[in-house]
Amino acid sequence: MTDQLITLIWIIIKIVLILVPLLVAVAFITLAERKVIGYMQSRVGPNRVGFRGLAQPIADIFKLLLKEVIIPTASSRYLYLIAPILSLVPALAAWAVIPFAQGWVLANVNAGLLFLFAMTSLGVYGILVAGWASNSKYAFFGALRSAAQVVSYEIPMGFALVGVLLAAGTMNLQGIVLRQSGGLWHWFWLPLLPLFVTYWITAVAETNRAPFDVAEGESEIVAGFHVEYAGVTFALFFLAEYANMVLVSAIATVIFLGGWLSPFQGIPGLESLFAWVPGIVWFVLKLSLFIFTYFWMRATFPRYRYDQIMRLCWKVLIPVTLVWIIILALAIEFHWTHWL
């Protein structure tokens, strides 16, 4: 009984050590986004609260917490309140299988890749419930758009993950990272380049971020599925969006960029020079690269029309992933490449 209690306490400690830095990072990612996009557009960005605006996320948190939670009279009260939680929980639960470094993982399961795919697919239920429970036509239209978009883009994302499974021969995420040992040119981004590009496009679409943010298109449907939300409930949706951004960036880091592995492996001189750098530092740096790409895409690309988004998925991404999976399977079977 004592051993079980100690194990339970240790698991709770590890969960806290994962979630607290994640939630703090999400808060400051919002500041980083506003600053980066501000510089891209020749603006200053937030600079009033704290030194150079560094306390802005804290002010935003207090602002959202102190706002009144208004529940529309005609809404389905309980579903309305549950919807933000349904969006946030899968984005946090998926971190259970993400390896930050060798042995640094909460649950080292052999079906980690499948678990991640399942968790990233569940968030849409919160959006659907929010659109339905709000009893608003704008919220409902936004929820329907989001559901169709996410379900469609899950197909090429699933095919991209199948390609990773073929290349690695395992669904264990630590095993996938170790399969990429050897340096920058041994990471899966190179032999699986079309699948890497496809995964990233689908990841942006799955998180409803620009330029795929038609689910909350301000110019068409006000604010989409969360138009009726305010205060803490809106904050949960906001948190879920950015938590999903960090999650899909972490997945891309693990399955395509070698996770915690150093990019200087196998390079004489540089490998020993950077041998002191902990694996988690490389992991965070690679993850930050993907987060910056989110900022860049939001600042650069205009919002696509809904029909353009669907056409890109069904007529471009799905055929590309199918063809590349076939080529990949043949390359592995007949040993056409030294990468796999």
UniProtKB/Swiss-Prot annotation:
This protein's UniProt keywords: Cell inner membrane, Cell membrane, Membrane, NAD, Quinone, Translocase, Transmembrane, Transmembrane helix, Ubiquinone
Enzyme class, UniProt record, top EC level: translocase
Disulfide-linked positions: none
UniProt GO cellular component terms: plasma membrane; respiratory chain complex I
Membrane topology designation: Multi-pass membrane protein
Location in or out of the cell: Cell inner membrane
Transmembrane segment boundaries: 9-29, 81-101, 113-133, 158-178, 184-204, 221-240, 245-264, 273-293, 316-336
Subunit structure: NDH-1 is composed of 14 different subunits. Subunits NuoA, H, J, K, L, M, N constitute the membrane sector of the complex.
MF annotations from Gene Ontology: oxidoreductase activity, acting on NAD(P)H, quinone or similar compound as acceptor; quinone binding
NCBIfam families: PRK06076.1-2
Stated role: NDH-1 shuttles electrons from NADH, via FMN and iron-sulfur (Fe-S) centers, to quinones in the respiratory chain. The immediate electron acceptor for the enzyme in this species is believed to be ubiquinone. Couples the redox reaction to proton translocation (for every two electrons transferred, four hydrogen ions are translocated across the cytoplasmic membrane), and thus conserves the redox energy in a proton gradient. This subunit may bind ubiquinone.
Catalytic activities: a quinone + NADH + 5 H(+)(in) = a quinol + NAD(+) + 4 H(+)(out)
Gene Ontology BP terms: aerobic respiration
Superkingdom of origin organism: Bacteria
Protein's recorded name: NADH-quinone oxidoreductase subunit H
Family as reported in the entry's similarity comment: Belongs to the complex I subunit 1 family.
PANTHER family: NADH DEHYDROGENASE SUBUNIT 1 (PTHR11432), NADH-UBIQUINONE OXIDOREDUCTASE CHAIN 1 (PTHR11432:SF3)
Major localization class: membrane
E.C. designation(s): 7.1.1.-
